[in-house]
């Protein structure tokens, strides 16, 4: 740990020095001196020097408008470099043990040591592994793609500099390259000027596949195979690839009017084009590698007389021609041209798999396994993991849009207004129509624009090549009719296959009713017959936490999953739980291993399907090596959860959780919904209103343009509180509820829960993480600078609550300080605080200046506005998340 941390500190210090030299070259010694003075004051302030803290505040308040931007940029860029160094150290040879591929070896050894598990059971669990990662655009990566590319290269330089045997000349060249990259970053505008379109977001997702996952996935499988061979004497079958990728970019239209049927159609084509492009590069490599002559009779027959000389090459060249023709056809479609379909148009994975696998089998049979298991095996595994679509797309739409569309249809048909019918009448109508062989609507019907959009989306799904759409997710699902409605709309569009339709239960009430809704659906004969023994249900983390607070939401999520698992098991249905976790803790984020092991027993039997959100994609999959670590962590957690499931919670533990949930929810809603001062306080103490100016994602920040906190999306809600360091949504109500249970004489039970129940210990661990990032003096400074004195009492009350909460959690965990069991993370937060604190102070100052100008009816100073955006990006980097 110490060796790793000192290596990280020395790299961070070296990068900081290079950044300092860059600033001096660009802006002169004076600005660098100013930045260095602020850094030293911040360090001393963190060490508890009150006089230096006051001097830090005064220095930042007195910066001229010309100094604001360089100072903000200096600290923001430093944090990006620190994050890059930290990402590198998590995968370096002396990196954090928990994130190395070794984690699989440790898990396999642990499983082998269990007296009740034999090797066959472990092999079966490996073969049933299923991991589907769903990439989403929001909260949206705040860092520009151009800067991400530079940081990837910085990472590569750090890796090479770590080599102890490097020659002086090479060391000099690498340092020169580092200086160039950091100078390029400094002279690049870190805030993008325009909001990305849904197509831009999709391209960002494809870039992650190309730059990291394309190499990372086969390398992870190679690593997994080696560990299985070493520990179980077992090799993965060639066609076994447990990892798949899906995307919401270009498919998620919930609250985003910019994602239309045409956009989805375009993104589907673009995704296929990118896949073709990447497979073309692979095949080109194989053409140069597979020059062998000896082959099996089967392969010779496939190659024919023309390919007799170099059969493998011949087949690869044939595949290359097919890929090029497919790419040209897709390019024409993307430009709006209609070309006749080429005879060899690639639309199915089998068309890629068959020639590649034929070559693989032949090489193995002819004693050339060493060649077969090289680039060729990697390409075969990419066919299984990415295939023709590259990433599949989920369609997501809000339930009310379907209800409104059906209402318009029934009114047109003169059979009443579907929207006003009872749930029983809706179900009766839907089941009747689903069983009917005739279409519901005449072809000449002209719907409204909103309804046409819903119907056109269903048409896009029906026309898409099979396998390119993964699921239809219904947000804000509340009733069985919400699910049946989508099935009817898809039937009307002429869909020729059974697409998984997943209700998303995301408020406290909906989570509590989820099992009833699914039980009713499974009791409908048509439904049971149609789903063919498989059901996907999505659990919403971010909206439930925003609705009820983290403690009540996490217990509702646990109970909903637990009940659904038991209901589906009883009904003989294979359940896939789809976890809509955010990156931040207030939106359900948690370290993967801990989060998975804290779920109810049996929750991963149907595999893991989970959203990977915005900025977390870069942290977890930004480099091939990091991808291997992240996938290894998921793999070990799924194996452990399925073979060593966590205990069923005791009845008294459930009772305590029910009490914690009830007390925390009342307190959370008491502030957020019922306190008349809360919304004005939130609006003034955080940069919530200013966040709208950041050109982040393609999706509006609010579901409805007007409205208070309840209409605000979970992401800006969390983002705003993260910026002012109160982190309120991630803890409000939780500590006070724990305190009440302690006062009721149940501290020893809470300690036992913390010790013996992964669900509860993970919950407390997440609270500790939030408390470590929260900061009382900074939150108070925002109040003093930005909030009217008549609202100060509310801020004081909230900060007192936070301080008391920290003490109660430490008492239950029997620790003297936060993050005692994760010193690596505690050190990392402390290191970044020195650079984040000045950005927070500066942000409060900039918000003050910006709002003063607005109140005086003046146009805001562009230097102030730009510096404000930079502080927002910088604090997000310091906190390691946006929303």
Swiss-Prot record:
It comes from Klebsiella pneumoniae (strain 342). Forms oxaloacetate, a four-carbon dicarboxylic acid source for the tricarboxylic acid cycle. It catalyses: oxaloacetate + phosphate = phosphoenolpyruvate + hydrogencarbonate. Belongs to the PEPCase type 1 family. SUPFAM superfamilies: Phosphoenolpyruvate/pyruvate domain. This is Phosphoenolpyruvate carboxylase. GO terms for molecular function: magnesium ion binding; phosphoenolpyruvate carboxylase activity. It comes from the Bacteria. One of its GO terms (biological process) is oxaloacetate metabolic process. InterPro entries: PEP_COase, PEP_COase_bac/pln-type, PEP_COase_Lys_AS, PEPCASE_His_AS, Pyrv/PenolPyrv_kinase-like_dom. GO terms for cellular component: cytosol. Its EC number is 4.1.1.31. Keywords: Carbon dioxide fixation, Lyase, Magnesium. Its cofactor is Mg(2+). The active site is at residues 138, 546. It is an enzyme of class 4 (lyase).
């Amino acid at each position: 740990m110490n060796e790793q941390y000192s290596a990280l500190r020395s790299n961070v210090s070296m990068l900081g020095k290079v950044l300092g030299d860059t600033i001096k070259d660009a802006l002169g010694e004076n600005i660098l001196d100013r930045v260095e003075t602020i850094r030293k004051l911040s360090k001393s302030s963190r060490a508890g020097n009150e006089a230096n803290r006051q001097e830090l505040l005064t220095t930042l308040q007195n910066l001229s408008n010309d100094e604001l931007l360089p100072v903000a940029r200096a600290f923001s860029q430093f944090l990006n470099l620190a994050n890059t160094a930290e990402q590198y150290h998590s995968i370096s040879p002396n990196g954090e043990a928990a994130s190395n591929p070794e984690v699989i070896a440790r898990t396999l050894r642990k499983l082998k040591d269990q007296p009740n598990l034999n090797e066959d059971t472990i092999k079966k669990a490996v073969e049933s592994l299923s991991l589907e990662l769903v990439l989403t655009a929001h909260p949206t990566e705040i860092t520009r793609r151009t800067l991400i590319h530079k940081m990837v290269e910085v990472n590569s330089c750090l890796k090479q500099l770590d080599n102890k045997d490097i020659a002086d000349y090479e060391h000099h060249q690498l340092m020169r390259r580092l200086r160039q990259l950091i100078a390029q970053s400094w002279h690049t505008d870190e805030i993008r000027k325009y909001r990305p379109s849904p197509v831009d977001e999709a391209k960002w997702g494809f870039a992650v596949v190309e730059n990291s996952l394309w190499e990372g996935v086969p390398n992870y499988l190679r690593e997994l195979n080696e560990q299985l061979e070493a520990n179980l004497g077992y090799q993965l079958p060639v066609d076994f690839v447990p990892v798949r990728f899906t995307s919401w970019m270009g498919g998620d239209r919930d609250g985003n009017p910019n994602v239309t049927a045409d956009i989805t159609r375009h993104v589907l084509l673009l995704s296929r084009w990118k896949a073709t492009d990447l497979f073309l590069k692979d095949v080109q490599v194989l053409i140069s590698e597979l020059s062998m002559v000896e082959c099996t009779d089967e392969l010779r027959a496939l190659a024919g007389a023309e390919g007799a000389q170099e059969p493998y090459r011949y087949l690869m060249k044939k595949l290359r021609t097919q890929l090029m023709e497919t790419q040209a056809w897709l390019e024409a479609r993307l430009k709006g041209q209609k070309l006749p379909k080429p005879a060899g148009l690639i639309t199915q994975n089998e068309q890629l798999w068959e020639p590649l696998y034929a070559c693989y089998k032949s090489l193995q049979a002819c004693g050339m396994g060493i060649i077969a298991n090289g680039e060729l095996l990697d390409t075969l595994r990419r066919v299984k993991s990415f295939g023709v679509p590259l990433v599949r797309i989920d369609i997501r739409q809000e339930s009310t849009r379907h209800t409104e569309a059906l209402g318009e249809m029934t009114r047109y048909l003169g059979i009443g207004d579907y929207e006003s019918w009872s749930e029983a009448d809706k179900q009766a109508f839907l089941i009747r129509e689903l069983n009917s062989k005739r279409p519901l609507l005449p072809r000449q019907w002209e719907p409204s624009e909103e309804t046409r959009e819903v119907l056109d989306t269903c048409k896009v799904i029906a026309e898409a090549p099979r396998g390119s759409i993964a699921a239809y997710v219904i947000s804000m699902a509340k009733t069985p009719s919400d699910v049946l409605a989508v099935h009817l709309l898809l039937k009307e569009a002429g869909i020729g296959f059974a697409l998984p339709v997943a209700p998303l239960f995301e408020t406290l009430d909906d989570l509590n009713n989820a099992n009833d809704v699914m039980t009713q659906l499974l009791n409908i004969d048509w439904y049971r017959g149609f789903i063919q023994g498989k059901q996907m249900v999505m659990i919403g983390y971010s909206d439930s936490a925003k609705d009820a607070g983290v403690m009540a939401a996490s217990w509702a999520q646990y109970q909903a999953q637990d009940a659904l698992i038991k209901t589906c098991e009883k009904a003989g249905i294979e359940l896939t739980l789809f976890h809509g976790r955010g990156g931040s803790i207030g939106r359900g984020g948690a370290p993967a291993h801990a989060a998975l092991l804290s779920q109810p027993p049996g929750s991963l039997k149907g595999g893991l399907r989970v959203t990977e959100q915005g900025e977390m994609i870069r942290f977890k999959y930004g480099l091939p090596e990091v991808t291997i670590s992240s996938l290894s962590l998921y793999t070990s957690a799924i194996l452990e959860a399925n073979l060593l499931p966590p205990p069923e919670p005791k009845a008294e533990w459930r009772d305590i959780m029910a009490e914690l949930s009830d007390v925390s929810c009342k307190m959370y809603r008491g502030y957020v919904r019922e306190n008349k001062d809360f919304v004005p306080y939130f609006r003034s103490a955080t940069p919530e209103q200013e966040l709208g100016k950041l050109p982040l994602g393609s999706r509006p920040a609010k579901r409805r343009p007007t409205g208070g906190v309840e209409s605000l999306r979970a992401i800006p809600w969390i983002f705003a509180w993260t910026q002012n360091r109160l982190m309120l949504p991630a803890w409000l109500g939780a500590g006070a509820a724990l305190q009440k249970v302690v006062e009721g004489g149940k501290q020893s039970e809470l300690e036992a829960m913390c010790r013996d129940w992964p669900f509860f210990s993970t919950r407390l661990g997440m609270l500790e993480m939030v408390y470590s990032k929260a900061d009382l003096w900074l939150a108070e400074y925002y109040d003093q600078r930005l909030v009217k004195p008549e609202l100060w009492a509310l801020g004081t009350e909230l900060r007192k609550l936070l301080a008391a909460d920290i003490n109660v959690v430490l008492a239950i965990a029997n620790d003297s300080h936060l993050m005692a069991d994760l010193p690596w993370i505690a050190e990392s937060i402390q290191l970044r605080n020195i650079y984040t604190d000045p950005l927070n102070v500066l942000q409060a100052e900039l918000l003050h200046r910006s709002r003063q100008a607005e109140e005086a009816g003046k146009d805001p100073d562009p230097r102030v506005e730009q510096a404000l955006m930079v502080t927002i990006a910088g604090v997000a980097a310091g906190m390691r998340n946006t929303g």
